[in-house]
A protein has these predicted regions:
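Hydrophobic h-region of N-terminal signal peptides that target proteins for export
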Residues: 8-17
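Interaction-mediating elements
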Residues: 19-425
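Positively charged n-region of N-terminal signal peptides that target proteins for export
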Residues: 1-4, 155
């Protein structure tokens, strides 16, 4: 709950009429305390007060209310005192929490720095984050709309509170609607000769799409960065998309996108180590499923794929919650890396309930009878494939689609299985 408190240090009502202080006077100083997020200068700028202007208690009440309504502060108190020169104002604030990041989805006409600078001249409390409560998010939307009008942009600025459904707000996402913003081409700086053709090939599908910073950032993480991780550049990074307007009409804005690549060192694999409890399976069995090759560039994407195969292996013994962490220990002096695979097998899961869907009652009964993994037995994640192979004669794959869904229940340490049969048309 936000609190706004006032303290009047000059009790004018107690003074004789001939010595009573004026209700309005010149503002000669402002002192701000209590915030670790903002500087006094930023908070003073947010008040809108100017030294030398004539002020009174009503002005200070308005300032306190304004600061409180932004959501940036959980408490706002003020006091003031008179002297022969004018009024001294003291503001005591307490920072509110939480704050979350702000994302600008498609403001392609200004760089991030230019946009931030323009915002800060109008919204001194903006620092790249906003409080989840209060009206500062609305104020920022109005500021962005004003900036858009200054640049003769006729779209409407809106924002979304991003986050999981029924979960906390994780970010504010601002965008401008109107004429489409289309990607013409994508380029990369900093990429090596071996990686550049691969990047260019992946980027071709982006050309012609609407510009979306969040989608491009996802592309960078999911499609561009793995190209470097596959080739041993374990510390590579892909910078944010940098749009440049190349053509603009009333109906469309076209942009070129540049990504700045920082590959870093290329690491070659020196050795593989297994740690944790590796007694469930012989070490040589585990190593058979790890395809990294000593002396070759360390393929981090392959390491993640190998982990999935190792998890499947552990699942055949009921370890459905096994944790396997591949950790690269890099050595920059000789550009080598030791990959350490740490195993935490967790608990053994048992077979739970079996559900069969999509068949008539008799066929359902036959499938339940044919399923040999009984409730309470140690679960085998490989059994479903064995089962599907055993019924392939009754349900040929070219005529039937059979989906297997495994649902581990962590509390009871069981796995419920659902088999869905759909006839292909």
């Amino acid at each position: 709950m936000k609190r706004i408190v006032l303290v009047l240090l000059a009790c004018a009502a107690l003074l004789p009429a001939q010595t009573r202080k004026p209700t309005s006077s010149k503002l000669i100083s402002i002192k701000v305390t209590g915030s670790t997020r903002y500087t006094p200068a930023q908070i003073i700028a947010a008040t809108g007060l100017q030294l030398g202007q004539t002020v009174n208690d009503e002005d200070f009440k308005g300032v306190s209310q304004h600061l409180g309504e932004t959501g940036a502060f959980s408490d706002v108190a003020y006091s003031f005192e008179f002297n022969a020169e004018g009024i001294k104002l003291a503001l005591q604030v307490k920072d509110a929490n939480p704050f979350v990041p702000v994302r600008f989805e498609n403001f392609v006409w200004l760089s991030d720095q230019e946009l931030a600078d323009k915002i800060r001249t109008r919204e001194p409390l903006f620092q790249g984050q906003l409080p989840v409560g209060g009206n500062l998010a609305d104020q920022l939307s109005e500021t962005l709309q004003a900036i858009a009008i200054e640049h003769n942009l006729h779209g409407r600025v809106d924002y979304l509170r991003a986050g999981p459904q029924d979960g906390p707000v994780e970010a504010f996402e601002y965008s401008i609607s109107g004429a489409p913003i289309t990607i013409r081409k994508v380029s990369f700086t900093g990429a090596g000769a071996a990686e550049l053709p691969l990047l260019t090939a992946v980027a071709r599908r982006i050309s012609g799409q609407d510009y979306s910073r969040s989608r491009l950032t996802l592309d960078a993480d999911k499609n561009f960065l793995p190209i470097f991780l596959q080739h041993g550049y374990l510390k590579a990074s892909v910078g944010p998309p940098q749009p440049k307007v190349v053509e603009e009409t009333a109906d469309e804005t076209q942009v070129d996108i540049a990504f700045d690549i920082t590959p870093g060192l290329q690491y070659k694999l020196s050795s593989i180590q297994l740690s944790g409890n590796t007694n469930i399976f012989p070490p040589e069995k585990l190593r058979e499923l790890i395809h990294l090759q000593p002396g070759e560039p360390a393929n981090a994407v392959q390491a993640d794929q190998d982990v999935e195969e190792l998890k499947k292996l552990y699942g055949t013994r009921g370890y459905m919650g096994v944790q396997i962490q591949p950790t690269p220990e890099t050595h920059d002096t000789d550009s080598t890396v030791t990959y350490v695979f740490k195993f935490q097998e967790g608990s053994i899961y048992k077979m739970g309930d079996l559900e069969v869907r999509g068949l008539d009652s008799k066929a359902t009964e036959r499938m339940i009878a044919a399923w040999r993994l009984l409730p309470g037995q140690t679960y085998d994640s490989g059994y479903s494939k064995v089962f599907l192979d055993s019924i392939a004669g009754q349900f040929p794959p070219d005529l039937w689609k059979i989906a297997v869904r495994e649902t581990p229940e962590d509390q009871d340490k069981i796995v419920d299985v659902s088999l869905r049969f759909d006839a292909k048309r």
